[in-house]
Amino acid sequence: MAFPLPRGVTPSEITFLCEMEMVTIVPRQRLEGLELLGGPTEPLIPPRRSSLPLWLALLLKRQRRANILPPPWLNTEWLSEFLKAETDHDVFLPPPPLDCASYTGSVARRDARRSGHSGPRRTLDGQRYIPSAPFLLQNVVDDESTAPRNPWLPYHWLELATMLLETASDDLVEPDQIRRIIRDIREIRMAKMRKFTEYVDATAIGGGEGLPLTGVGAMEIGEARGFMSGAAETLRQIGASKEEALREQAEAGDDLRNDYDEDDEMEL
């Protein structure tokens, strides 16, 4: 017996997409560059930093060939400030803007040299290329970048933090404290997601404006998709049955009034 397909993207598929995020490593030994589908990687020369996809960085870390530098947001100071701001607001904090690079300085110049493009990247029709997750370089380390005024979390924050805490906890500062803050942030944001169920009724019937999901992470959307879509479908069916009952009552009332009119005409 075949089971029905899950609604939306599964957690394992979301984790797979997160593994394409770029992170910064410090190699322990020399390695030649690789020809990947996303483009070639630069040769690894210790102790020079390099940017690699997360899946490759985790593989080298397990083989003890490299150390992974934690992203700029994966530290106790940043996460504590984000936790406080998330607690003080009823809505999700906004993510970093897509048209504003989260890194400036050496990383940007190195990527420009590798790609051969000195100016901003363009699409085939000449428009400015604006990448989206997991192709936003929000998890690379750049010493020359300036910290943003307001804390934010990347789109794949939960998956990336979980994988780094499992595989590269020795490369993080105070990993136990980071794990605790991540758990607190996750609980607060899931509580906010559960509050959104009050909008599902109006959205399912058709009179609502939709669910505001700006700032929600990939794994959070994946976890809530099954419940939200199932609840919306149930409420839609309930609303349809109510409309059908009201329609039948209206039709029955019209028939009853027509019968009364016919009786009056016969008496005359």
From Swiss-Prot:
Segments of this protein annotated with the region Disordered: 245-268
GO cellular component terms listed in the entry, alphabetical order: GINS complex
Compositionally biased spans, kind Basic and acidic residues: 245-259
SUPFAM superfamilies recorded: GINS helical bundle-like, PriA/YqbF domain
Positions of transmembrane segments: none
Superkingdom, natural source: Eukaryota
Gene3D superfamilies for this protein: 1.20.58.1020, 3.40.5.50
Key words of the record: Chromosome partition, DNA replication, Nucleus
Record bears the keyword Nucleus: yes
Location(s) in or outside the cell: Nucleus
Gene Ontology biological process terms in this record: chromosome segregation; DNA replication; double-strand break repair via break-induced replication
Key word Ligase present: no
Similarity section: Belongs to the GINS2/PSF2 family.
Record's subunit section: Component of the GINS complex which is a heterotetramer of SLD5, PSF1, PSF2 and PSF3.
Job of this protein: The GINS complex plays an essential role in the initiation of DNA replication. Has a role in chromosome segregation.
Protein known as: DNA replication complex GINS protein PSF2
